[in-house]
Amino acid sequence: MKPFPTHPDAIPAELQDVMDRLGSVAIEVANRIARGGIDEDLAGLCGTNTDGDGQKALDVIADDAFRVALEGSAVRFYASEEQDTAVTLNEAGTLALAIDPLDGSSNIDTNLSVGTTFAIWPAAPRPNPSFLRLGSELIAAGYVIYGPQVCMMVSFGKGTQKYVLDPGSRSFVLVDRAVKVPPSSTEFAINASNYRHWPKPIRAYIDDCVAGTEGPRGRNFNMRWLASLVAETHRILARGGVFLYPRDSRKGYEQGRLRYLYECAPIAFVITQAGGGATDGENPILGQTPSRLHARTPFVFGSAEKVARITAYHDLPEQETSALFGNRGLFRS
């Protein structure tokens, strides 16, 4: 059975075959994760990627599976977190696909949700120009989350769709054609252990949230942190709120930690198509062009009002950050 047997009109015809291939591999990856520890150790380290990050066994397994499945498809160039350079799959192809085959793989041994993120551009004649381009030129992007439910959230530029994997039929069922980010929430996600390294506008924003009813926001907030980008995204699409992974003063974190091409760009596309916002803290993510395949960027996304507020903190002169948003009690929503 095809992985997307229902609502054939929901996927553009020129992308149907590629989506079928992505969906089929996602179903197999989900099954492999569910059997982790029975047949093999999926959490064991087996190498490092181009940026020196440790690769889990399932990182490599998933990358190989997606790459092989896309051979002979319309995908001309394939760029992966697990590959140093882009790979040519089909010289006659018309698409360029960037992918993180297994985002959040550090969570495999703890049984927390992990996922796959992907982004699709029209292919240029050569690999680098196909990928080193504006995020706004994406024609499709999405993610799969392997959790209690296996879900795919995807956009083809006309809103964000939600599919749920039916284990019985081993197919993805369209359950929502127009997912929307809730406009308001009292949740924010950030790794607070890095507070001392953050830029002042980020610290000021978090300080105001932590102050709760006694602070300028006049309400209490809850902090979340899962260390899984797809899990954080899925929660925000369901409940609203904001995710922050800012640049900081540590060596190697000056431009944040998340990769633009196959992490931030696809998530930003899905979120903005669902009515949310996505920036690097100051400027829209989709208005940026990465300088290299594995370029990093600070990342802030979520409910549009929350993202706009954080941008406004950056726009203020340093001496006004606390005064305008604190003592004067503006923007209390």
Swiss-Prot record:
Q: How is the cofactor bound?
A: Binds 2 magnesium ions per subunit.
Q: Which GO terms describe its cellular component?
A: cytosol
Q: Give the record's free-text account of how this protein's activity is regulated.
A: Fructose-1,6-bisphosphatase II is not light-activated.
Q: Give the enzyme's EC designation.
A: 3.1.3.11
Q: What is this protein called?
A: Fructose-1,6-bisphosphatase class 1 1
Annotated positions binding substrate? 103-106, 191
Disulfide pairings:
none
What family does the Swiss-Prot or TrEMBL record give for this protein? Belongs to the FBPase class 1 family.
Sequence positions that bind Mg(2+) 2: 100, 103, 263
Task: Name the reaction it catalyses.
Answer: beta-D-fructose 1,6-bisphosphate + H2O = beta-D-fructose 6-phosphate + phosphate
Instruction: Add the further remark from the entry.
Output: There are two genes for FBPase in R.sphaeroides.
Binding-site positions, Mg(2+) 1 = 81, 100, 102
The cofactors it requires, by name, are: Mg(2+)
Assembly with partners or alone: Homotetramer.
The annotated pathway is: Carbohydrate biosynthesis; gluconeogenesis
Q: What is its main location?
A: cytoplasm
Where does it live in the cell?
Answer: Cytoplasm
Instruction: Tell me which stretches of the chain form a coiled coil.
Output: none
Any one GO molecular-function label of the UniProt entry: magnesium ion binding
Biological process annotations from GO:
fructose 1,6-bisphosphate metabolic process; fructose 6-phosphate metabolic process; fructose metabolic process; gluconeogenesis; sucrose biosynthetic process
